[in-house]
Amino acid sequence: MAGHSKFKNIQHRKGAQDKKRAKVFTKLIREIVTAAKTGSSNNPENNPRLRNALTAARSQNLPKERIDKAINSANDSSNNENYTEIRYEGYAPNGIAIIVEALTDNKNRTAAEVRSSFTKYGGSLGETGSVNYLFNHCGVIQYPINIASNKDILEAVIEAGGHDIISDDTTHTIYTDIENFSKVLEFLTGKYGIPEDSYIGWIPLNTIIIDDKEKAEKLLKLVEVLEESDDVQRVFGNYELSDDVYEIIQGEP
């Protein structure tokens, strides 16, 4: 995972996501409902996916009453709302590989929306499996840099069973095997509290540096449009903005 310390560049700008809190809440609620319905139990103690979903929801300050409502909705036998997990893969301009993870109640609608977004911004949607070999599928847990020293959090990650940690100026990013994700998340939450973010995702094995402002803006617009869909849970790409381009874009209104 070395070389991916600028994690903020890989998954688009967090500030842009924060402005869309209503959509973030919608995505979190879908995951809670799906986890409660598809898991072995609606008790988070016995359902790791639901436990992880609740941790993610709390990290984004999803109100407790909305969490409870989502779980109750999943338990309601008259509720026919079911979501299907789908992964879309394709290329953005300049050979950037993109993975889109979705939870949808209408696969045809979501596929059309995702394909249209790729086409509109100069990309192309491929078959499932066309780019995932360029990524590592793993658990990701993020804490603010001031939560602990690099040494202390590294020791905690090793004890918990995580396999890597990268720290930059603002964030400790911990990586885990998928099978250990829930255990590591629970251990670190007990030690440091709820993380800023936690999920199972696709982290690029290598990144392509984007050092042109126009190319970066077009790429980020594609990511933004994809993320605006209620059906899309997360978007991943094997790109990284150069420091200069990142500073220019961050400084724009």
UniProtKB/Swiss-Prot annotation:
Intracellular or extracellular location(s): Cytoplasm
Cross-referenced InterPro entries: Integrase-like_N, TACO1_YebC-like_2nd/3rd_dom, TACO1_YebC_N, Transcrip_reg_TACO1-like, Transcrip_reg_TACO1-like_dom3, YebC-like
Key words of the record: Cytoplasm, DNA-binding, Transcription, Transcription regulation
Keyword ATP-binding: no
Superkingdom of origin: Bacteria
Gene Ontology MF terms: DNA binding
Gene3D superfamilies in UniProt: 1.10.10.200, 3.30.70.980
Single Gene Ontology BP annotation: regulation of DNA-templated transcription
Residue ranges of the region described as Disordered: 1-21
Pfam families: TACO1_YebC_N, Transcrip_reg
CC annotations in GO: cytoplasm
SUPFAM superfamilies: YebC-like (SSF75625)
Coiled-coil intervals, chain numbering: none
Annotated family: Belongs to the TACO1 family.
Name of the molecule in the record: Probable transcriptional regulatory protein RC0681
Lineage: Bacteria, Pseudomonadati, Pseudomonadota, Alphaproteobacteria, Rickettsiales
